[in-house]
Amino acid sequence: MNGMKRYNQPVDIIIQQTTAKPGAKGIAYAGAAKTIEKQLEAAGIPVHSVRRAAVISSASSKSKQKTAIPENAYTKTKINDTEVNPWDVAHIARTALNNPHTFVEPDFLQEFTINRKVNPEAGKTDAKSFGNRNNDINYDKDWPPHQNTVWHLDDAYSQLKSARELVQDNDALIRIAHLDTGYSATHFIVPGSVKKNKLQRNFVDGEPVNDAHDPLKDGFLKMPGHGTGTLGILAGNKINLHTDNGQFNDYLGGAWFAEVICCRIASSVVLLKTSALAEALNYVTQLTISGTPVHVLSLSMGGAPSAAWAKAVNAAYNAGITIIAAAGNNFNGLPTRHVIYPARFGRVVAACGATCNMEPYFTLKPGEMQGCFGPKRHMKKALAAFTPNIPWASTAGNNIRFDGAGTSCATPQIAAAAAIYYKKYFDQLNKLQPWQRVEAVRHALYTSAKKTVEHAPLSYQQYFGNGILQANDALEIPVTTGITKTPEDHAPWFPILSTIFKNKNPQSVPVLQMYNTELAQLVYSYPELSKLIDDENRSYDKIGVRKWKQFKEAVVAHPDTSVTLKKFLVKM
């Protein structure tokens, strides 16, 4: 999950611009792209293209929401990322644009950890998180349950089957945005309504914008089919399947009744472009405030902190969209054992993993993929669902496997539960302010969650946050309005910047925000830096001066720190 790795490709940047006065021009006006290109070229940055995100015209006059959608300009340069640090390009661009309200960040390719290990029986490389095993044993023998069954829907686990049956006669239309690698055009698990939905979008460069299907192309750093697997768990078709404990003849999807809007944000779950996720989040928010409300968003990917992601999450929250995002995966704590972004943001539900025996999705066995969790101070908005060894729609054989794994599998279970709750309390929720709907849904899921953990040295909060999903019990929690609005999300603030820059509100200064975002990405990407500030287990404002001094020196010496940030820190 290294968010700063370079791939010998041109540097892309995301330009965000606020305005000094109401009514002043930002970057959304006609001709802005050309102006940006000229300014960057004049500063010595060769530009390939500048593009502003498309704006959706209002589909309904009924919408009275005033949620502000972030104004972003996505710029492709001709500078190679191995020649110049992308953050240095971002700083040069900010200076060239000559606007104190401009924020620029690199449009990094984010790595999302999945599992590749040798399958002893087949002697082949295995992407376990996709359920692509090539032998007669469908489940992963390293984890329970040790049989091929559809178990996660049952009352002893997520309770999704009972919960959805309770609301099946309710005719309220629930929409779920599904952000992933798209869907298979041929797999039987994908509902026809998903394939026909005209609201589907593709945010992968060079692919048709209105077609979110996954062409399932193999190749270097490509892992096709991930979106089909998560979609099956979220809203998959009815299937008739022989299992070790009998015949399963029911819907695989926890929220099969929902209208699903697929957004293809990556050609592979292994690599995710920062801008693609930001654009997809903003697209879903635009739909909502334009009269086509999206109630829940399921995201089984993520990476390093990004300002564009934070702003997109804030806009979605204010529009009333409940976001469920994967907490991430790791191998024995690498690249990080802690929850990734955007799942770590306070306005997002972080989907962690719990095994079928209520144990943490954690192991000390070498080379074994497991789920991210913690630090505890960032688990207040987290929730766990079941993984691994749950049914997975595999595109390799166009079938159902029983070794679905990773927090990618937990995410759609929680999203389905959120959709079920919204379906039951549709009228009551719609009477609330949009952000209150998010808080009411989350309150029900958190309050009803099972507060337990088995065979673990720490409390359930450490691994599961608010507990383990209990979808049917959540329906017993009435809609509440007495919850405080969650503060706006942003990259964690580094106090050393406040001491360097004497300003009444340093966090509002774009250039400092840029330094701060780079620091956050460095800490996220490099464990040796994270360890210097207590591996993020303590709040930054409680870390002593000596440790901050050591941290600053290490950042200045680090090869992946931008020259601009190094110079700034040295001046301290």
Would you name each region that the model predicts?
Residues 53-67, 120-147, 203-220, 286-289, ...:
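Surface-exposed intrinsically disordered loops and tails
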Residues 122-260, 276-294, 557-560, 564-565:
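Active-site core segment of subtilase-fold serine proteases
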Residues 2-8, 15, 21-23, 30-151, ...:
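Autoinhibitory propeptides
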Residues 180, 340-423:
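Extracellular S/T/G-rich loop segment that most often corresponds to the catalytic His/Ser-adjacent loop
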Residues 237, 262-347, 358, 395-412:
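Substrate-binding/access-modulating region of protease and related hydrolase catalytic domains
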